[in-house]
Amino acid sequence: MIDEAFAPAAAAVAEGRIPGAALGVVGADGRRSVRFAGMAALRPEPEALTEDHWFDLASLTKVIATTAMVLRLADEGRLDLDRPLTDAIPDLRQYDMAAAERRLTFRDCLGHRTFLPAVEPVYTYGNDPARLRAFVLQREWRHGPPVYSDINFILLGIAVERITGAPLSDWPLGAELGYGPPPGPAVATEACTWRGRILKGEVHDENAAALGGRAGHAGLFGTVAGVLGFAQGLLDGRGASPAALAAIRAPVHANRTCGWERRFAGWHGGEACSAATIGHTGFTGTGLWVDFDRGLAWTLLTNRVHPSRHRDTGIAELRRATGEAVIGAWDKAF
């Protein structure tokens, strides 16, 4: 089954569209299969990809870490999803008590239904993580229609740190998941013009790097096994409460739930998955999808930005083709 499911990714590696790829599939009963091919790095020294390599998970941080943290704190009664972020961050836009940012709720940010912009080059405003956090909190953000926004999750990350009194990196995320630098071999990402080097074991996202390497929107690293372990916890119910599972599956805005995307026409998970499927992707070439009806999850991890993001790797179509192949192979096998 796994060989059939991995065929699109194997072809992408063989054709030179991406340096390396790993596919992991897990069922609710814990059965797992993994395949990988290609290179963890092309530069500065060639390095073959192995099952033990840690990937920069990019925006999978939003669901594996930040969303899970927020929902756990809600379970514990330490925050209310429908209360404003100012419950945790009283100094958010503190010099304008009428500011719209002060009315944003945790659920608003989780579901990307705010007016905040998709992204802002926060890293260009300085190199002190504490001052950059203050900048994010005090900035009068330009308003626009709801979009998928890193700023939403930077704010959520700050809120989690305020509530717990500890950095995000202190949160126990599970085996083979954590903020960088990872403890094992790392997959290379981009030749970063800002930092003047090829990144390997340090976060690719510029804003996350400037915020100290750990932020609500990016910064998490993990192996295939680590991502599958998280996904299995969602499938078997051991990794999230019933309330948290309901929150990540129920629509909040358009095709979004608390943190995740729901299946919609043209999404990166493919068309074959059930309507009860949620997923998320990461800029570095990562992705995770969970089909609750089938009791199935799969993760496709690539280093498609290595050595540069400025090339057409066909990652969107590869993700869709992989989703179709995974579901097709699963349905034939079970």
Would you name each region that the model predicts?
Residues 2-57, 78, 309:
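Short, conserved catalytic-motif segment at the N-terminal edge
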Residues 6-10, 23, 29-30, 56-82, ...:
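Active-site SXXK
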Residues 19-21, 284-287:
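Short loop/turn microsegments at loop-to-beta-strand junctions
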Residues 33-35, 288, 295-304, 308:
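Short, well-ordered beta-strand elements
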Residues 34, 84, 96-276:
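Short, surface-exposed loop or secondary-structure junction motifs
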Residues 55-58, 146-148:
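Catalytic tyrosine of NAD(P)H-dependent dehydrogenase/reductases that use a Tyr as the general acid/base
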Residues 85-93:
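Acidic helix-start/capping segments at beta-turn-to-alpha-helix junctions
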Residues 236, 243-244, 249-254, 265-267, ...:
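Short, gly/Ser/Thr-rich active-site loops of penicillin-recognizing serine hydrolases
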